[in-house]
């Protein structure tokens, strides 16, 4: 009796489906902590950094890690995979990967945003950090130097006082535009300096955010314009943003902060008459504290006489209320009249 073709195909399909279902549901058992799957992340400005690695342990091999089969020097043939000379995998099991959400520089050399396989060629007194396009490999067994994107040198710090049992990546010495990724294992530390162009990356983020619904939000536009003024960048576009904010038919925000931002941008664009007119309008809207802050700003800009006018106006308008006497003291001091400064200093107490 012949089996009909449709029934035969149905049997094959069901068998294939069952095999795949069983494979997908195979039991998973922890590896007993031999190599701990680990992740570490940090944000620098608007740049996200993430490292994924498996963390081997020293396991009694102290003094026999570096320059041995555990973490060999240079490039060695591992005997499996591509059978090519390969660097250390900077971890265990799968390839270590590192991701950057924006362009960065590594020890001063540029690296584009993306995710990379991370390897290290170890030497006695230096290390070559290797960023590679292959992020799916098993360790460095299938390392292909043709996929390398960046090589950069760093110097390891040997003889750290405390031994680190598990290979660890963590973040140290962070500033507003940089951070050092530290690989610590046994008594070695391998530092990797990461820097970002804070202004460039932040501006790109601002533009991206304002391209959506946030671009219709006056407070967001005001914040973006003020940031550009403070960071001396993107004046023309920032002025277009603040114009929307202060327009009586659009944003309708006529506060001291918004108007002074507009005045500052006009001044940066070499439009002093327009700037002065807007700044006068801003001062008419200002609170005592806002005027005081503006006067201090003028002193910091090396304009003590202009600052004195602001402090005097503030003192008279607000009838000596705090902090106007403090402003008068600062103004007289900046203009070299210490006697009058002392007089108003006593009034401020």
What feature does the model see in each segment?
Residues 26-45:
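Short N-terminal segments immediately surrounding and downstream of signal-peptide cleavage
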Residues 52-113, 119-221:
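Extended, well-structured beta-strand/loop surface patches
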Residues 219-331:
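Alpha-helical adaptor scaffolds
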Residues 1-27:
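Bacterial Sec-dependent N-terminal signal peptides
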Residues 267, 283-286, 333-349:
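TPR/TPR-like (Sel1-like) alpha-helical repeat modules
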Residues 25, 50-51:
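Charge-dense, helix-prone N-terminal extensions
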């Amino acid at each position: 009796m012949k089996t009909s073709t449709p029934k035969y195909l149905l049997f094959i399909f069901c068998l294939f489906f069952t095999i795949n279902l069983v494979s997908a549901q195979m039991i998973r058992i922890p590896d007993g902590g031999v190599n701990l799957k680990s992740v570490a992340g940090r944000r620098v400005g608007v740049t996200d950094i993430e490292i994924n690695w498996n963390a081997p342990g020293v396991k009694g091999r102290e003094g026999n890690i570096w320059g041995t089969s555990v973490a060999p020097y240079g490039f060695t043939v591992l005997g499996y995979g591509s059978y090519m000379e390969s660097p250390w995998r900077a971890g265990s099991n799968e390839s270590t990967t590192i991701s950057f959400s924006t362009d960065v520089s590594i020890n001063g050399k540029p690296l584009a945003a993306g995710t990379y396989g991370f390897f290290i060629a170890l030497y006695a007194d230096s290390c070559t950090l290797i960023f590679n396009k292959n992020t799916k490999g098993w360790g460095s067994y299938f390392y292909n130097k043709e996929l390398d994107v960046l090589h950069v040198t760093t110097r390891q710090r040997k003889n750290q006082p405390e031994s680190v049992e598990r290979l660890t990546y963590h973040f140290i010495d962070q500033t507003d535009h940089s951070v050092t990724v530290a690989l610590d294992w046994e008594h070695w530390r391998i530092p990797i300096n990461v820097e970002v162009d804070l202004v460039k990356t932040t501006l790109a983020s601002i533009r991206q955010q304002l391209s959506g619904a946030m671009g219709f939000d006056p407070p967001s536009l005001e914040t973006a314009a003020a940031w550009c003024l403070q960071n001396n960048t993107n004046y023309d576009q920032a002025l277009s943003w603040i114009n929307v904010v202060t327009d009586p038919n659009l944003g309708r925000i006529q506060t001291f902060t918004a108007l002074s931002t507009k005045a500052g941008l006009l001044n940066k664009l070499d439009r002093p008459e327009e700037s002065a007119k807007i700044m006068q309008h801003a001062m008419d809207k200002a609170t005592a504290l806002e005027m005081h802050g503006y006067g201090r700003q003028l002193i910091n800009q090396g304009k003590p006489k202009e600052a004195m006018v602001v402090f005097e106006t503030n003192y008279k308008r607000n009838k000596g209320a705090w902090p106007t006497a403090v402003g008068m003291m600062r103004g007289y001091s900046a203009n070299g009249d210490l006697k009058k400064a002392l007089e108003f200093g006593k009034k401020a107490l």
